[in-house]
Amino acid sequence: MLINLYRYCISPFIPARCRYYPTCSEYALEALKTHGILKGLYLTTRRLLRCHPLSKRDYYDLVPCKNKKG
């Protein structure tokens, strides 16, 4: 998976800069695991677009729970 490639081959060589907990790569893995490929990619993309120095968001940004109907 591309996220694991980034985490183990690229991330160790660049300074930690993620503004959130969990990190963006951890968030992406959890979002994909919890919500599947489509919603997981949507949530990950939204998160990456918010992760920048001018962001006014809270430090904690957790993957939303999966809604169960019924």
Swiss-Prot record:
The name this protein goes by in its record: Putative membrane protein insertion efficiency factor
A Gene Ontology term for the protein's cellular component: plasma membrane
Natural source organism: Francisella tularensis subsp. tularensis (strain SCHU S4 / Schu 4)
Protein family per UniProt: Belongs to the UPF0161 family.
Keyword Cell membrane listed: yes
Database matches in HAMAP family: UPF0161_YidD
UniProt keyword annotation of Transmembrane helix present: no
Places the protein is found: Cell inner membrane
Alphabetized UniProt keyword annotations: Cell inner membrane, Cell membrane, Membrane
